[in-house]
C-alpha cells in the first residue's frame, strides 16, 4: 500500500495517517515530522525551515525533496509507505514521478476552510509539557490555565488566526492544484511505465471514527 494523503492544514491528515499506517503496516513519511525534528535539532536545514514555518509559508521544494529522498532509502519503505504533507506542489509531484516513486492511491480529506480556521485558531498549548487544549472542543478546567500545573497556556504563532488564514491561502495557490493533477493522471492511466494512482475523496467532517471508516472504505 503506497499512498498520498492530501488536504488543507488542519484537515485531520495526521490523525487519519496513524490509523492507515497501523492497518496496513506501513511507515508514515511526514515531512512535517522531519522538519520539526530538524528545527528541534537546530540543524542548518531546521533553522532555515523555521523561518518559513513561523511565517505560515511553505518550506521550499529543494529542502523538502532532500529529506524525502533520504527517507525512501530506509528498509521499512520496501513494502509501502504513506506520504503525509508531501508532495505540496506540482513541482514536487513531478519530481516524485520522475524518480519513479510508485503510488497506489491518492486520498483527499476535504474540510471547509471556515471549519479549519475554527479548529486551529482555538488550540492552546502548555509549553513546558506539550499538553494541548482547544477553547471549544477540549477546554481546560480553568480558562487559559493548564489543568495539571495551573500555569498559563499560550497560542502558538502558527495557530493564530491570521497565520492559519495565510497558510490556507498558500495551500489554495500551491497545493490544491494537486487535486486536479492526480485526478487527471488517474483518468489518463499509466505514464512512462508508472501506473497511475487511484484518486479518492472523503469528507473530513464528523467524528474521528467516522472519518477513519470513510478512509478505510476508500482504500479497499
Curated annotation (Swiss-Prot):
Single annotated GO MF: ATP binding
Keyword Repeat: no
An individual GO BP term: AMP salvage
Name of a matching Pfam family: ADK
Region called LID, residue ranges: 122-159
Main location: cytoplasm
Catalytic activity: AMP + ATP = 2 ADP
CDD domains membership: ADK (cd01428)
Positions of AMP binding: 31, 36, 57-59, 85-88, 92, 156, 167
Pathway: Purine metabolism; AMP biosynthesis via salvage pathway; AMP from ADP: step 1/1
Residues annotated to bind ATP: 10-15, 123, 132-133, 206
Subcellular location: Cytoplasm
Gene Ontology CC annotation, any one: cytoplasm
Region spans: NMP: 30-59
Subunit and partners: Monomer.
Entry comment, domain topic: Consists of three domains, a large central CORE domain and two small peripheral domains, NMPbind and LID, which undergo movements during catalysis. The LID domain closes over the site of phosphoryl transfer upon ATP binding. Assembling and dissambling the active center during each catalytic cycle provides an effective means to prevent ATP hydrolysis.
Protein name: Adenylate kinase
Organism: Burkholderia ambifaria (strain MC40-6)
Taxonomic lineage of the native organism: Bacteria, Pseudomonadati, Pseudomonadota, Betaproteobacteria, Burkholderiales
Gene behind the chain: adk
Amino acid at each position: 500500500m503506497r499512498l498520498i494523503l492530501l488536504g488543507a492544514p488542519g484537515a485531520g491528515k495526521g490523525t487519519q495517517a496513524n490509523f492507515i499506517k497501523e492497518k496496513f503496516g506501513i511507515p508514515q513519511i511526514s515531512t512535517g515530522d522531519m522538519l520539526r525534528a530538524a528545527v528541534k535539532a537546530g540543524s542548518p536545514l531546521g533553522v532555515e525551515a523555521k523561518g518559513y514555518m513561523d511565517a505560515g509559508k511553505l518550506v521550499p521544494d529543494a529542502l523538502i525533496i532532500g529529506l524525502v529522498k533520504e527517507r525512501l532509502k530506509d528498509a521499512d519503505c520496501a513494502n509501502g509507505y504513506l506520504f503525509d504533507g508531501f508532495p505540496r506542489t506540482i513541482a514536487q509531484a513531478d519530481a516524485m514521478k520522475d524518480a519513479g516513486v510508485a503510488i497506489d492511491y491518492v486520498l483527499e480529506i476535504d474540510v471547509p476552510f471556515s471549519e479549519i480556521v475554527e479548529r486551529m485558531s482555538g488550540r492552546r498549548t502548555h509549553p513546558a509539557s506539550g499538553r494541548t487544549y482547544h477553547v471549544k472542543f477540549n477546554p481546560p478546567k480553568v480558562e487559559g490555565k493548564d489543568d495539571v500545573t495551573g500555569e498559563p497556556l499560550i497560542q502558538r504563532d502558527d495557530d493564530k488566526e491570521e497565520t492559519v488564514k495565510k497558510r490556507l491561502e498558500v495551500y489554495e495557490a500551491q497545493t490544491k492544484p494537486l487535486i486536479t493533477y492526480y485526478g487527471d493522471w488517474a483518468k489518463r492511466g499509466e505514464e512512462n511505465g508508472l501506473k497511475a494512482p487511484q484518486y479518492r475523496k472523503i469528507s473530513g467532517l464528523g467524528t474521528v471514527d467516522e472519518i477513519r471508516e470513510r478512509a478505510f472504505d476508500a482504500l479497499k
